Amino acid sequence: MKTVKTKDFEKEFTKLPFSIKKLFETQEKIFQKNWLDSRLHTKRIKELPGVYSIRITRRYRALFYFDKNGDAIFFAIGHRKEIYRQ
């Protein structure tokens, strides 16, 4: 599966601590093999139809959706208390 990151995602990603960036890269590799792997704690966001989250740490999440080609589009990353407000 192909993953794409939006400009907004990349902008927020650059602001994250190095340790969170490395953990996301690890999670992304798992995601590409199986987006429903239990280590990702993938959840559907009820308030945002078609949007899902994966857990990076207990506090950090990344949001994504699937485009018409089946590619995963990551559009937000950040602290769990702030990310859903975007």
Regions found by a protein language model. Give the residues of each.
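A short, surface-exposed loop/turn module that caps and links secondary-structure elements
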Residues: 30-54
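Enriched for short, Lys/Arg-rich terminal
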Residues: 2-7, 11, 18, 56-61, ...
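Active-site metal-binding motif and surrounding structural segment of the metallo-beta-lactamase
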Residues: 24
